[in-house]
Amino acid sequence: MSSSTVPAAGAAAAMLLVGTSTAVSATIADYPVLSGQALRYALAAAILLAVVRHRRLPRAGLTYRDVLLLLALAATGLAGFNIFLVEATRHASPAVIGTVVGAIPIVLALVGPLTERRRPAARIVGAAVVVTLGAAVAAGFGGGSLRGVLLSLGALAGEVAFSLLALPLLPKLGPLRVAAYPAALAVPMLLAAGIALDGTSSLRLPTPTEAVAFGYLGVLVTATAFFLWYDALRRLGAARAGLFAGLVPAGALVTTVALGLGEAGVADVAGALIVGAGVLIGLRQPAQTGLDGQADRRVPRSPAEDEQPVPTAPERQ
């Protein structure tokens, strides 16, 4: 089995899980959005921190730089992303938002290597363009105002920050802690934003159906997917891991069809096939070279953690 097979499978699983949130979120459409995200992250943080404690990982002393990075990650990649996304839906169609945010593979393919003082690999950039094209075909292009596009770009920036701000933290803290700490920090940020935008009416108990949906989102789409993503990010690097972000529409499509909420159209299937082709192009390893034809510069493992998966509670993003 290739050394990249396991992290690649983890990245694919993470993005497919994130994609399922689209259909599941339809069941909580009447719940205040930002407060709901705070509830989801609180559940995920509780699970991840419990796993950290159960595994008795060595203490990792946080420097001021670590704390600032964690706060920035929570503020931009989690809270900021959700705020921009919610506001964007008021000024642009879901297709526009999906197409803009779907450019994440290209951005990571270009910016990821630059953060490591390397030139972007032409093959990975080309693969990212193919993946983004596939995501755009699946999402459609829709319509929206300039403000909606700008807000969508803000959500895209949050997605980029979610990965790039984690890179310097992963060698020291490992994927479990990097998934857990920002999730916990984002909870008060989202609660405050929810109260500011919707008032105290945003604070209410979920119905039983909503509670089940939040349980799924918190346990699988957040706790599990975040861990899998950060583990893959550490082992594949931002450019190659970013290719798998194109699988989000595929996850949404499968869940929508499975739940009987819609049917798979020609554009959906074509987009998924294009995304798959782009991922395969990006994962193909040139003979006798590193992953991108250069020295392999993946993020080293944390001495505090191995790659054990997150234990999941029975029926526990």
Task: Please name every model-derived segment.
Residues 3-7, 30-38, 62-67, 140-161, ...:
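Juxtamembrane helix-entry segments on the extracytoplasmic side of multipass membrane proteins
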Residues 11, 63-73, 119-131, 149-152, ...:
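Cytoplasmic-side transmembrane-helix entry/capping segments in multi-pass membrane proteins
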Residues 35-46, 76-78, 82-119, 152-155, ...:
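Specific alpha-helical transmembrane segments that line the substrate/conduction pathway
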Residues 19, 23, 74-79, 83, ...:
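Hydrophobic/small/kink-forming positions within alpha-helical transmembrane segments
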Residues 17-22, 49-97, 101, 130, ...:
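Specific transmembrane alpha-helical segments of multi-pass solute transporters/efflux pumps
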Residues 1-38, 44, 83, 87, ...:
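Glycine-/small-residue-enriched transmembrane alpha-helix faces in small-molecule transporters
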Residues 48, 103, 120-140, 157, ...:
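Hydrophobic transmembrane alpha-helices of multi-pass small-molecule transport proteins
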Residues 11-15, 39, 96-103, 164-188, ...:
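Helix-helix packing/entry segments at the starts of transmembrane helices
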